[in-house]
């Protein structure tokens, strides 16, 4: 039988004051450089937050294809436990530029909301990042919290 030890490591991505991530715009700003690494693939990220919504870190959960990525609640919340985060914001990009949620995006958000309740971790928002020029509203992102779906 093999027994493994779980751990978490940190790589400095930004030096300065603790960034409070409490709006969709700040979420997009915090993850901008992360999404730039793979602009033609969907990437799903979780931002780990303390009790004052200060970022403890960010973790890429999944890197997919041009049009989808696989996400499971277990993988989303594992880093939150390891970092002792009290809340999370999840986000993914739409390489097409249109941030409108798909049926799969809505379903995943519902699953994450239910898992968060059970695990007693606050799911603050799920933000889909696109491009302002492809967004009918012109903002370039979609927030499940702002639209009342979370």
Q: Could you say what each language-model-derived stretch is?
A:
Residues 1-12, 17, 50-52, 62, ...:
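Active-site-proximal loop/helix of nucleotide/amide-processing enzymes and allied scaffolds
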Residues 22:
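Extended substrate/RNA-proximal surfaces in nucleic-acid metabolism proteins
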């Amino acid at each position: 039988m093999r027994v493994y030890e779980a751990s978490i490591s940190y790589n400095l991505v930004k030096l300065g004051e603790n960034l409070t991530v409490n709006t969709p715009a700040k979420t997009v700003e915090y993850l901008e450089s992360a999404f730039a690494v793979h602009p033609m693939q969907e990437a799903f990220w979780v931002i780990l937050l303390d009790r004052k919504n200060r970022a403890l870190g960010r973790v890429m959960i999944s890197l997919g294809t041009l049009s989808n990525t696989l996400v499971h609640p277990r993988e989303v919340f594992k880093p939150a436990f390891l970092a002792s985060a009290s809340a999370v914001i999840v986000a993914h990009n739409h390489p097409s530029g249109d941030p409108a949620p798909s049926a799969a995006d809505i379903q995943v958000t519902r699953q994450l909301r239910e898992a968060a309740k059970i695990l007693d971790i606050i799911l603050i928002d799920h933000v889909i990042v696109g491009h302002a020029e492809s967004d009918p509203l012109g903002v370039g992102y979609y927030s499940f919290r702002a639209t009342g779906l979370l």
